[in-house]
Amino acid sequence: FLKEGIDLLIVSPNESEPITPVVEKVFNRGIPVIVIDRTINTDRYTAYIGGNNYEIGMEAGRYAAALLKGKGEILELKGLSGSSPAIARHAGFLKILEGYPGIRIVRSVAGDWNWNIARQVMTNLINTPLTYDLIFAHNDVMALEAYKVLRESVSPLDPFILGVDGLPGDEGGIQFVLDGRL
């Protein structure tokens, strides 16, 4: 696409690392680059439009600590391993939990932002002796699947479930909360 003489590059990277060299090459040629939703591993772009996922993780950590009253065990369903939101949300969450020695993450697994993968992970975990008081899912879709698996099982666990994004629409996090599913 560089040979076609583009005037502007707008990217919304799935993962941070793979697209970074291309963005740097385009930016170094004087072509403006706008990065949307997810960051990349360079500062060689013109503008970034998106949320502060580190702060989102910190806010989730604060809320988790309040729900658990400073003591409990957490299962974390992370997003795609190489994606900047998953990395930043995890880091922000951990930063807050450092101040709560009575709270620990007992398992942190990748759900890849995907309901089906989150369902598989939760189904596998439901048959283990692992216990947790709260599930922190990096997005609402994974949180909803965790909720569904727990309700469909005979598990005695009844953890708090936190999801992130709060998207609108029938299949968004806001509706999940309004329906009592989260």
Regions found by a protein language model. Name each.
Residues 1-182:
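A residue-level marker of the well-folded mature domains of exported/periplasmic proteins
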